Amino acid sequence: MSKWKTIVVGIDGSPPSRTALTWAATEAADHGADLVVLTVWERTLLPPMGSGGVPRSPLPDPSQRATEDLLTVIKAELGEDPPVPVHPLVKQGNAAQVLIKQSADADLLVVGTRGRGGFRGLVLGSVSQHVAAYAKCPVTVVR
């Protein structure tokens, strides 16, 4: 049995992050660890604009939307009754920085190869590269 007690997986809803989620859940089940499923939203500087340059209203609460999206992905990938304790976590900020900070409380950090942004030709996205270089715990990049 492993010493892992907490596995953190970063997801953004992209196919690679969904694969990372299912991989991390399997590892957590195999090692008797809790699974923290983390998503990060970044504040946009400008609200969505309607016609005439007038902001659309009402503006959705990005934290609430991120939470709803996170719970939807967890349910879609792990089902109604996941095989491990799952702790959804929503944070605001830069994804790489938030994941690195969260890695201080983890025994393993799991990310997908690429997220929603970036260039299609890259094997690793900028977030996964940055996290792999600076995390405070071991990192697994799932393909």
Question: Residues of each region from the PLM?
Answer:
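Structural beta-alpha unit
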Residues: M1-K3, P16, D30, A76-L109
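Small/aliphatic-rich secondary-structure junction motif
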Residues: S2-V54
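Histidine-centered beta-alpha loop that forms part of the nucleotide-sugar donor binding/catalytic region
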Residues: D12, G93, R114-R116
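General small-molecule cofactor/ligand-binding pocket signal
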Residues: V36-L38, H87-K91, T140
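Short, hinge-like loop/turn segments at secondary-structure boundaries
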Residues: G52-R56, A106-D107
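A short acidic, glycine-rich active-site loop
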Residues: P55-D69
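Gly/Ser-rich helix-loop-strand patches that form or flank binding pockets
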Residues: K101-R143
